Amino acid sequence: MRVLLIGAKGLLGQALAATFSTEDLVAVDRDVIDITDKVALQKFCHEVRPEIVVNAAAYNAVDEIEKNDEAAKQAFVINAEAVGYLAKASIENKALLIHFSTDYVFDGAKDSPYIEADHPKPISVYGRSKLGGEEAILRLAEHGLKYYIIRTSRLFGKSSGAGKKTFVDIVLEAAAQKSELQFIDDEIASPTFVSDLAMAVKEMLMSRPAFGVYHRTNDGYCSWYELAKTVLNESGAYSINHATPDRKYINLRPIASKDLPRPARRPAYSVLQSTKLAPLRHWREALREYIISNHL
Ligand SMILES: NC(=O)c1ccc[n+]([C@@H]2O[C@H](COP(=O)([O-])OP(=O)(O)OC[C@H]3O[C@@H](n4cnc5c(N)ncnc54)[C@H](OP(=O)(O)O)[C@@H]3O)[C@@H](O)[C@H]2O)c1
């Protein structure tokens, strides 16, 4: 299977590159091809002639995009317009396009998990830019584009080089330096291990379900506070809110999102339910594996 992976140096991109390394893989990032350059992208895709195009490129700086007009413009170019270019190049090469989207396309007002058919209603500029990417694909689906739009949430995993740190690593670093930590307790979603997501993508390529929108996250859900607490417990190095010998004491407090003002609004509840495919393993099990193999 000839696979063109775009955004290969990002957090998810690195996990996808590892998972697809046994395939005929061309893994690139912005230094090789900038997806916002329509002509260069089209030429590059014609040269590579992929059967599968996996787009893990995105502009994800949620707060920067909200407060800075230039960043917002960039977000729409990368997350929406360029996705249209990729979709067009995929049709021209008869390739299947796999694209990632986010729980932030929903407003969070629902009190049960969002299913694929729920109507998106983003409450941030980032969310609107990602919805723009979904719409660009759906427009070309009417012209024969083969596609999977995969919505996911709260990615964690190992990221080296230019890849960014995720919440799990940020919590462990903060706990090593401080003894008082506080995290938001009223934003609920599903943490997702990038290696599990990458494997789930590979499985979709084997089983080839119908083209469309899919929800792929680890099973279960939690707040940021509960995730932080689980991370600290799993690391085995900290005792939380009560002193224990041989472990560093951490005073861990839940806070409300209104007490941590940030430029962009986040959905209060954005659990994604998969009605089309079997759920992935529980996030606690995936987190344990990640911490054991990277932090112990
Ligand atoms: N992270 C999460 O928690 C999360 C949650 C839900 C959904 N998602 C979705 O999952 C996907 C992967 O996210 P991620 O967290 O892995 O992203 P990431 O770590 O920010 O990686 C994105 C990659 O895309 C590259 N890129 C950006 N603009 C590009 C361009 N114009 N041309 C080519 N490459 C470009 C970036 O390169 P530079 O470093 O040079 O910019 C970076 O290597 C995205 O679609 C995202 O919306 C992520």
Descriptions of predicted regions:
Residues 138-189, 196-199:
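NAD(P)-dependent short-chain dehydrogenase/reductase
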Residues 70-77, 81-85, 105-150, 154-156:
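Catalytic helix-loop patch of NAD(P)-dependent Rossmann-fold dehydrogenases
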Residues 265-296:
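C-terminal amphipathic/interface module of NAD(P)-dependent oxidoreductases
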Residues 6, 28, 56-57, 97-102, ...:
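SDR active-site strand-loop-helix element
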Residues 3-19:
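N-terminal Rossmann NAD(P)H-binding glycine-rich loop of SDR-like oxidoreductase domains
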Residues 200, 207-263, 291:
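Mid/C-terminal beta-alpha module of Rossmann-like enzyme folds, strongest
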Residues 38-78, 91:
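NAD(P)H-binding glycine-rich loop region in Rossmannoid oxidoreductase-like domains
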Residues 21-43:
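Adenosine-cofactor binding site in Rossmann-like domains, unifying the SAM/SAH pocket
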